[in-house]
């Protein structure tokens, strides 16, 4: 029995299950929809960017730059306050989801 448990544990460690993050759910859960709209195509304010259809790599880098402070202007003040809630994997998932929206 001990041997079986060791085999199960070894198999679990050897094959890490990487669950795909749900970009749509993260977009909502991280409150992106509050300013950029439910589908990222109708921002709350005219000066907020439409994110639907944005290039994934560009969107990912912009979010990372806002989070790190590398992009720091008047437009980023509100986002800076919430980006600490989003990790790099979640940023990538959100950016990928945004790129697939129309």
Predicted regions located by residue number:
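Positively charged n-region of N-terminal signal peptides that target proteins for export
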Residues: 1-5
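Electrostatic cytochrome c docking/interface patches
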Residues: 12-28, 42, 47
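Small disulfide-bonded, cysteine-rich extracellular recognition modules and tandem repeats
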Residues: 13, 35-38, 54, 82
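Sequence context surrounding c-type heme c attachment/ligation sites in exported
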Residues: 20-33, 52, 56-61
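The canonical Cys-X-X-Cys-His
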Residues: 31-38, 94
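Axial heme c-ligation environment in periplasmic c-type cytochrome domains
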Residues: 43-52, 65-102
């Amino acid at each position: 029995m001990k041997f079986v448990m060791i085999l199960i544990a070894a198999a679990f460690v050897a094959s890490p299950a990487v669950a795909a993050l749900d970009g749509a759910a993260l977009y909502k859960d991280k409150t992106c929809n509050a300013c950029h709209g439910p589908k990222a195509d109708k921002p709350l304010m005219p000066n907020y960017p439409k994110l639907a259809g944005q290039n994934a790599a560009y969107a990912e880098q912009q979010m990372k730059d806002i989070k790190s402070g590398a992009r720091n202007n008047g437009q980023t003040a509100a986002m800076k306050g919430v980006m600490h809630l989003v990790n790099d994997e979640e940023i990538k998932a959100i950016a990928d989801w945004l790129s697939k929206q129309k």
